[in-house]
């Protein structure tokens, strides 16, 4: 019987789900807003909120617990230094999920998950290689 067994499988193996939540939580901490499916956003929310609660408590043991779940040193630093201070006076509810319509290709419900009181300038920050005019000239 599966009484009180929570969480969605999202048609993935356990290791794939773990990797998915690690990557999405790192992206959310970095950009403070990401677009994903509604089901993934609903599963990601408690994962990230527990990380912020660990960061608010501080300490070496909590930092190691957060690192075990996140495994991204730069985002871990931002989590403990920036986000923990930002949400020090807030008791939970650090994220919000906003429905973003239907994806055209497969009709999946999309959603934006973002931090409450987020830094608007963090969105799209260093999101990959950027082509410069020199790169375009060399390719031609």
Curated annotation (Swiss-Prot):
GO biological process, one term: translation
InterPro entries in the cross-refs: Ribosomal_bL17 (IPR000456), Ribosomal_bL17_CS (IPR047859), Ribosomal_bL17_sf (IPR036373)
GO CC annotation terms, alphabetical: cytosolic large ribosomal subunit
Xref: Pfam families: Ribosomal_L17 (PF01196)
A GO molecular-function annotation: structural constituent of ribosome
Subunit structure, interactors included: Part of the 50S ribosomal subunit. Contacts protein L32.
Protein family: Belongs to the bacterial ribosomal protein bL17 family.
Name under which the protein is recorded: Large ribosomal subunit protein bL17
Naturally occurring in which organism (per UniProt): Rhizorhabdus wittichii (strain DSM 6014 / CCUG 31198 / JCM 15750 / NBRC 105917 / EY 4224 / RW1)
């Amino acid at each position: 019987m599966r009484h009180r067994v929570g969480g969605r499988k999202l048609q993935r193996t356990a290791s794939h789900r773990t990797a998915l939540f690690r990557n999405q939580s790192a992206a959310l901490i970095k950009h403070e807003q990401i677009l994903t499916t509604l089901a993934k956003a609903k599963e990601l929310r408690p994962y990230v909120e527990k990380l912020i609660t660990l960061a608010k408590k501080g300490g070496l043991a909590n930092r190691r617990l957060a690192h075990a779940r996140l495994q991204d040193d730069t985002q871990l630093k931002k989590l403990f230094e920036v986000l923990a201070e930002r949400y020090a006076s807030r008791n939970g509810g650090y994220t919000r999920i906003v429905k973003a319509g239907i994806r055209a290709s497969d009709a999946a419900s999309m959603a934006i998950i973002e931090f409450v009181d987020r830094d608007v300038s963090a969105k799209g920050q260093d999101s990959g290689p950027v082509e410069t005019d020199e790169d375009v000239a060399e390719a031609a």
